Amino acid sequence: MKALVIIDVQNDFMPTGSLPVKEGDQIIPFINAEMQKGYDLVVATQDWHPATHKSFASQHKSKKPFDVVQLNGIEQILWPDHCVQGTFGAQLHKDLDIRPISAIFRKGMNPEIDSYSAFFDNNKLNNTGLHGFLQDKSITELVFCGLAGDFCVAYSANDAKALGYKVSLFDKGIRSIN
């Protein structure tokens, strides 16, 4: 059984958002078309941070976006405030067809630790529930797309491999920060 996993296609990652991914909006038509290709399951994720999230540069005196700090023993890039719970920036982009999506998994809700992966927070102490959901649906193969390819998509794909899934990337549906 095969699932499409759509990572963080949210307003704040679009070209006009607070943490823009170049050409992030251009992947949406490709993802919408890909969802129609007979997957057994389609799921999505949302970055869903509290306003006081410690990955935000605004929460650290004399720090700016893209500075690097230690946060709970893990190297953390400080980001501009983005995908704050309940804001327009945290919403999935309006052009993403959400009808085929069976479930949306939110991540990054613990203000003390970031969560790039769709499966775990960055210290791997807490999970999002995605793995259990996929197991319940007998999913063994995952295809990833979304934003950003060099962070949340990559971390999610690597964790999926470590969890035993067969993993592939839908390249037309991915853009990266760097």
List each model region and its residues.
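Short acidic, Gly/Ser-rich segments with clustered Asp/Glu that frequently serve as metal-coordination loops
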Residues: 10-16
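Short, glycine/acidic-enriched loop or turn micro-motifs at the edges of active sites
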Residues: 11, 50, 110, 149, ...
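Active-site flanking residues adjacent to catalytic metal/cofactor-binding acidic residues
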Residues: 7, 46, 171
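Active-site alpha/beta core segments
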Residues: 29-141
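Short glycine-enriched, charge-decorated loop/helix-capping segments at active-site entrances
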Residues: 17-24, 118-122
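Extreme N-terminal starter segment of soluble prokaryotic enzymes
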Residues: 1-4
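A short glycine-rich beta-strand->turn/loop micro-motif centered on a GG-aromatic cluster
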Residues: 143-146, 166-178
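Histidine-anchored nucleotide/phosphate-binding helix
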Residues: 34, 151-162
